[in-house]
């Protein structure tokens, strides 16, 4: 029987009472499925439920076959050896003991049928570009991106029937991403992948769109899905226009009917006052008129209510594509203004900047390089979080740095309170007015940061830094699109389009870098920082 995932009447609620799923029914069959949806829709939660990391409040999750799960945030014990991280340490030790002449039965039981486990492990590492990593090395010696691939290699060695990947390309350089793409393409079983990586999602066979606790299916990859979505959106917007026209018509008809009824009432009162007919006749006529008027009014009110309901349904069918709108005139930097200077800079972990490097005016700089090259270390040094090993670094304008870990937020404070910390001179009304531009309106601004989804948390952190006082004229972002859905990436792009200061972005997401108007490309490679041409970027990232 083909391996599959069957979810029946699934309900799940977080400890604080926030519902995620109520009666969800869905099945994933053979092939590669891209699970998409806005941040906070429950994509990662669904993967964790399927993987058995979370238990449903109600309903069932059944998986035919073994499950392999790559979480969004990969953490490995740095003291482990690579073979331990791969799950083959015991078998490898038994093999070596047998090769050394120890024929104890326990060693043969440990090896089982996996006599080629070491060769398979080395092959799996090689396929993912980790052929240089020895099995006896410790995990602490590999970079963050390599640890993701190491965890994936461990899963591939297990040969699970079902593979669940949650944002697998986060923290991977372009070279590592291509290795992962190849592994995804060659996967023979059931795969469900959550990602904002368009190139990865274009490798899937179908898209499952999770929205409002329900899943809609689209055949084909992400590009095909986007085309289908555009057609749906246009149709939904047409239905809104039709429903609005009908609603206006019903309002006019109700108003006209009310005017006519008022005229009749005045005429009837006039007849009564003038007593032109017997009282009993006029009374009967008045009661009949009132009954008719009541029925007429109720009919029009019902029609109006039905039109209102159709309009609400039509509006609900249109996707909410809110965009961040930022107007920050104090972030503007004059073209000739010196923003940042580096002189013979030596970083704590070995990288260096030979000679001098200068940023002027509202330049937009991309910092690229392989995993472990030192990009984050360089940004932290510029931000003043790390002391330089040698040389000098100086920011000549107010600077703000948004790290990957988003620890600029205090999880126990609300969104509004976090922003107020960075703008102590701003009134509460001013803070909330500014937050509305970052889509935190009303009660959303009163959410605690710890309860936010990945995209919301990033948006709140970005708001805190961009709304800070003094206004940042140099903004540095470290892998900003990690953990963001497509809508959030579009929102970030819009926000950065409105930003008038200088920008330095470390990212492996080349389409995103191109969309924010990068003007200079800096490559950190083999311990040296150098400027490269845009044409060379795709070969160097």
Give the label of every model feature segment.
Residues 7-10, 17-31, 59, 342-361, ...:
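Conserved beta-strand
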Residues 30-33, 45-106, 361-429, 508, ...:
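ABC ATPase nucleotide-binding domain signature region
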Residues 79-80, 84, 213-238, 524-541:
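Conserved beta-strand-loop-alpha-helix hinge in the C-terminal portion
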Residues 76-144, 404-474, 479:
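ABC-family P-loop ATPase nucleotide-binding domains
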Residues 163-167, 172, 402, 474-479, ...:
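Catalytic Walker B motif of ABC-type/P-loop ATPase nucleotide-binding domains
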Residues 152, 180, 462:
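Hydrophobic anchor residue at the start of the ABC signature
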């Amino acid at each position: 029987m083909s391996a599959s995932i069957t979810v029946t009447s699934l309900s799940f609620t977080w400890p604080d009472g926030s519902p995620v799923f109520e009666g969800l029914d869905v099945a994933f069959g053979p092939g590669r499925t891209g699970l998409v949806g806005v941040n906070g829709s429950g994509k990662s939660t669904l993967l964790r439920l399927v993987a058995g990391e979370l238990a449903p409040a109600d309903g069932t999750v059944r998986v035919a076959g073994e499950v392999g799960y790559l979480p969004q945030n990969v953490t490995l014990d740095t003291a482990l050896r690579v073979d331990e991280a791969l799950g083959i340490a015991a078998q490898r030790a038994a093999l070596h003991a047998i090769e050394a002449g120890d024929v104890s039965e326990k060693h043969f039981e440990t090896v089982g049928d996996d006599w080629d486990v070491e060769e398979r492990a080395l092959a799996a590492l090689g396929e993912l570009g980790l052929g240089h990593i020895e099995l006896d090395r410790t995990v602490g010696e590999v970079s963050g991106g390599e640890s993701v691939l190491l965890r994936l290699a461990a899963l591939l060695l297990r040969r699970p029937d079902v593979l669940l990947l949650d944002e697998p390309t986060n923290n991977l350089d372009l070279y590592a991403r291509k290795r992962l793409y190849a592994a995804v393409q060659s996967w023979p079983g059931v795969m469900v992948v959550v990602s904002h990586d368009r190139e990865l999602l274009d490798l899937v066979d179908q898209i499952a769109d999770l929205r409002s606790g329900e899943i809609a299916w689209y055949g084909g990859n992400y590009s095909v899905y986007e085309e289908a979505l555009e057609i749906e959106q246009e149709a939904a917007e047409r239905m809104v226009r039709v429903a609005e026209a009908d609603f206006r018509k019903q309002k006019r008809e109700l108003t006209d009917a009310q005017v006519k009824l008022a005229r009749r009432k005045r005429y009837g009162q006039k007849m009564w006052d003038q007593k032109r007919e017997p009282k009993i006749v006029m009374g009967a006529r008045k009661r009949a008129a009132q009954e008719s008027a009541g029925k007429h009014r109720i009919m029009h009110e019902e029609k109006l209510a039905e039109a209102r309901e159709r309009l609400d349904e039509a509006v609900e069918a249109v996707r909410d594509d809110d965009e961040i709108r930022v107007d920050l005139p104090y972030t503007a930097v004059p073209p000739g203004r010196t923003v940042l200077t580096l002189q013979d800079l030596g970083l704590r972990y070995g990288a260096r900047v030979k000679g001098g490097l200068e940023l002027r005016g509202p330049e937009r700089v991309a910092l690229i390089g392989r995993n472990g090259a030192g990009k984050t270390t360089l940004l932290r040094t510029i931000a003043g979080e790390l002391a330089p090993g040698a040389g000098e670094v100086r920011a000549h304008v107010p600077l703000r740095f948004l790290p990957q870990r988003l620890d600029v937020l205090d999880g126990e404070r609300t969104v509004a309170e976090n922003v107020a910390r960075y703008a102590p001179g701003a009134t509460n009304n001013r803070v909330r007015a500014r937050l509305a531009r970052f889509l935190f309106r009303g009660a959303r601004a009163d959410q605690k940061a710890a309860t936010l989804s990945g995209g919301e948390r990033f948006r709140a952190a970005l708001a805190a830094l961009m709304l800070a006082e003094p206004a940042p004229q140099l903004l540095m972002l470290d892998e900003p699109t990690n953990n963001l859905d497509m809508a959030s990436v579009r929102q970030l792009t819009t926000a950065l389009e409105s930003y008038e200061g200088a920008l330095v972005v470390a990212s492996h997401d080349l389409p995103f870098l191109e969309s924010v108007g990068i003007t200079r490309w800096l490559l950190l490679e083999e311990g040296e920082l150098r400027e490269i041409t845009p044409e060379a970027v795709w070969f160097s990232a």
